[in-house]
């Protein structure tokens, strides 16, 4: 299956490829249909872990994950979405498998299952608007993406043009998920460090050619928030070089790592270097 470069669909695709031990290009629509039993169980286990319990409302508020009582289970809900495929153009993957006019309103695709899709034709939580063309396969993969999510102040995901990065990122997250679920991990007092998770991934490379975007989002309540940080390629390669020269800890002591996400590293780096040089000169004068 080709990537859509939608952050949720792509992360779900890599998660599925991880559990099926396949390359993403070898994933078929039949694989997605056949995976629903397995992946529904994985998601239920994941959100039942206290450490990650907030993610279900931050990602899929008003869904079968957050309101299971009296409604279909997540498994049944996803199976129902698959049955409501059509032959209209999907605005995410470009395939002709979407269906807008669905008789059973329970299976209209809205924000409860598809974060960050905003349009005049897209269903909101109250389902009083016309639907946007999104196929059920993209919806199912979007639900799977929760397994790659982490929480800082917001839920967040990475997306990259680098296939290697996405595979490494997914593998790292899923291994951590497995351990946390088995141990019944509790909520952490300190929020997950977004920059540190990036460092641990990219520093295994000798160089990095792709681009990385970080999506921070909250899809709870009647409004949704999303912020996209584009992480410059040169910043990623700088982290790699600092790691090679054992300077990464010094870099972080100057609190320069936080400027990677907002794209202002150069100016703040020069300011810190100037400050250090100035302090060194003052020390030299005092010693004279």
Where are these regions (language model features)?
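Intrinsically disordered, low-complexity regulatory regions
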Residues: 180-288
